[in-house]
Amino acid sequence: ANSAAKFHLYPHVEARYKLASDVLMIHAQVSGGMQKNTYKAMTKENPFTGDFVLPGNTNNKLDISGGLNIKLDKEILFSAGASFMRLKDAVYFVNDSTGALNYTTFSTIYSDADVITLKGELVFERNEKFNTHIGATYTNNKPDGLAKAWFVPAVEINLGGYILLREKIIFKTDM
């Protein structure tokens, strides 16, 4: 048995409230959890991860989030949200300068971090046969002991949608 093993207890509280029937809804959540950082998960996130990485766990000590959904009309929905996470031992990728092929692979380091995320999305949906959406996410990731969160995008923009062509034929895209 590992004498360093610790027991963790995490909150999970969620609240939703409709302010104006189906037009405006607000929501909030407080949670946390433990995330396994396996070699398989790290190479899926970054295929250039080197062979000598240390698997570990990221302790999401606290995750507070909230937002609102506004139905602008019967076919258009706008949603916005914000979150704050306090992470212990979050995994970050850095250039591996020790290998034979310097700077062509990445190694991992673990650092505590505070992460603030702001996001918004606009959705257009017509009678369950056509849907399109555009959204943006801004992330302020502040790891301890690192100049910045390397290889973690600060801004992400997504665009996508689907069309139901026939009963069992769906065309779907996400970028």
PLM ranges: what are they?
Residues 6-10, 14-175:
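Exposed, low-structure sequence patches enriched in small/polar residues
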